[in-house]
Amino acid sequence: MKLKTSAKLYVYMIFAWLILLALSFKDFYYSFRGVGNNYILFILLVMNTLFICYFWLNGMKEIFYVFFYWKNKNKIIKIPRKKITDNPKVILLYCTCNDFNADSLAKSMKQKYSNFETYILDDSKDKEYIKTVNAFAKENNVKVIRRKDRIGFKAGNINHFLKGKEDYDYFVILDSDEVIPKDFITKALKYFYSYKNIGILQANHISSRNINFFMKVFSRGVDSHWPTYQSVKHNYGFLSLLGHGAMVSKNCYKDTGGFPHVVAEDLCFSIEARMKGYTTAFAPNIICEEEYPVDYLAFKKDI
C-alpha cells in the first residue's frame, strides 16, 4: 500500500484567495488613479499591491490549515499496526557541536528494540565538550565519529559518516536536546512496512523541560504547531523532514544522494526524495521531546 495525499486544501485556498482579490480589484484600481507620470510612485504602488496579495495568500493558508485540522481532528491519521517480522538494523545518529546533552542521549538510547546502534557525530571544538562526549561514550559503549573540518555543518556531518556505509537499513536523526520515546524504533518501522513509498518518517514533538518564563510562554507554539500543521500536511500536499526526531530509510538516502550542503538541508532533502519517488509521512503517535530556546538570542540563533 502507498501513502497518498490530496491537493484539495490548496485548490480551495487559491480559489478563496482569487475571490478576495476580485472583490478588492476596485480598491486596487483606484489607488493607481492620479499617479500620472510619477514612475517612482507607480513602482511603489505595484510593490505594495504585490506584498498585500502575498500576505493575503499566506493568511488564507493559515486559515485553511486551522480549518482543515479542526474539520478532521477526530479523523486520526491511520496508525499502522503491522507486525515487524524481520529485524532491520537501525542506527541512531546524535549530532552535536559544543552542545552535548548526556541526559537526552541516555534517555533516547533506552529503546525497546535489539538491533540498533548509537553513534555520536561530534563536530565540537570546545575541549570541555569533547571531554564530556568521550567520557559518555566510554561509559555507555557508544562510538564517536569526528572529522577534520565542519564542511556542510550538520548535513556534512551526517554525510561524512554515512558515506560508503552499508551495514544499516534505517537511521534516526537526533539533535542535542532530543529525547525520543522508548518505542520510537518499533513504532516508526511499522510505517515503513505499511506504506511502501515512505522514505522519511517525521515524528511528533512537544516542548519539555521549560525552566523559565520565556520558554513556558513561547513553547506553546511548538505544542500547537506540530499536531496542527504536520497532520494537515500529511494528508494534503507536501510534508518535509524537520531536521530531527525522524527516521530515514537507507534506500531513500542513497537514491537521493545524501543531504545537500545548504541552509535548509532537511527541506531540500525532502524535495529530492519526493523527486525520486519517496514521500515523507507524519507519525502523530510517536511523541518526542525537545527544548525550547532559553531566551530570544538563543531562539534567533536556532532559526
Task: State the predicted function of each range.
Residues 1-84:
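N-terminal membrane-anchoring/stem segments of glycan-assembly enzymes
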Residues 88-91, 117, 268:
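Cell-envelope/extracellular polymer assembly enzymes that use nucleotide-activated donors
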Residues 106-115:
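Short, acidic, metal-binding catalytic loop of nucleotide-sugar glycosyltransferases
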Residues 114, 122-132, 148-151:
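A conserved acidic beta->alpha catalytic loop
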Residues 135-138, 145-170, 182-263, 296, ...:
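Long helical/loop segments within the catalytic core of UDP-sugar-dependent glycosyltransferases
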Residues 261, 270-288:
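Catalytic donor-sugar/metal-binding loop of nucleotide-sugar-dependent glycosyltransferases
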Residues 284-299:
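Active-site donor/metal-binding and catalytic loop motifs
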